[in-house]
A protein has these predicted regions:
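N-terminal membrane-targeting hydrophobic helices
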Residues: 2-138
Length: 138
């Protein structure tokens, strides 16, 4: 079957697959955070929600510089904090450590699930780490 003029055909690109995988990861970590929150009460709910929002609060590190920056661009001095909070390896390694070590405080694990969900949603929607000037990496 051939495509007619003016129509487009769907393509599976690595970027689409990558974003789909990040979306699946986001849904998994969100579901895990909800399960942990339901099982362990308000402290788990509060920490899961806090860590779902916390990574984007790094924009406030240089809030005074915001009027001089482009929309959605953090100031260069906020970029290291932003990138540190948006690396998936950090909360994932902490979650692995939580499961291996004799730590038993479920709200901490719910917080890590919320943090991983945030990072995964960002990647699924096309947001990622920043350059040192604060622009999206390509």
């Amino acid at each position: 079957m051939t495509a007619t003029a003016g129509t487009t055909t769907a393509r599976t690109t690595p970027a689409v697959l990558r974003r789909g995988a990040w979306l699946a990861s986001a849904l998994f970590w969100t579901a895990f955070a909800v399960v942990e929150s339901v099982n362990h009460g308000w402290p788990a709910v509060a920490l899961a929600l806090a860590f779902l929002v916390l990574p984007d609060l790094t924009f406030l590190v240089a809030a005074a510089d915001a009027p001089r920056m482009a929309k959605g661009q953090p100031a260069p001095r906020a970029v290291p904090c932003y990138n540190a909070m948006h690396r998936a390896l950090v909360p994932f390694a902490l979650a692995v450590a939580y499961t291996v070590l004799p730590v038993d405080w479920p709200p901490a694990f719910a917080a890590l699930c919320g943090w991983l969900a945030h990072i995964s949603y960002d990647r699924a929607f096309g947001y990622g780490l920043r350059t040192k000037e604060g622009f999206q990496r390509g």
